[in-house]
Amino acid sequence: MTRRPDRKDVATVDELHASATKLVGLDDFGTDDDNYREALGVLLDAYQGEAGLTVLGSKMNRFFLRGALVARLLSQSAWKQYPEHVDVAIKRPIFVTGLVRTGTTALHRLLGADPA
């Protein structure tokens, strides 16, 4: 992929996959049972045809979408590494919500550090 600093399109599905793969060194995005590739293509078409993104807006969305694909790669890798976790029931999930800069990240990390 050639870098174009003035690029106004966000990217193609294949370019985003290649970028995410290069970043983390993984290439298994899992099955496409949820049709995420098609949905990603629709989103990219909308960015290109409807959103009127600036060059900066395109870069920001490219970065955001690549991050989502990296998360998918890491998640798939973890499911493959620990397949027994599929059978673990989550009985009482905890949702941490709040406004920006109110300590939700700190609370989330604190809860995540609990060995129980």
Language-model segments: which ranges?
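PAPS-dependent sulfotransferase catalytic core
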Residues: M1-A116
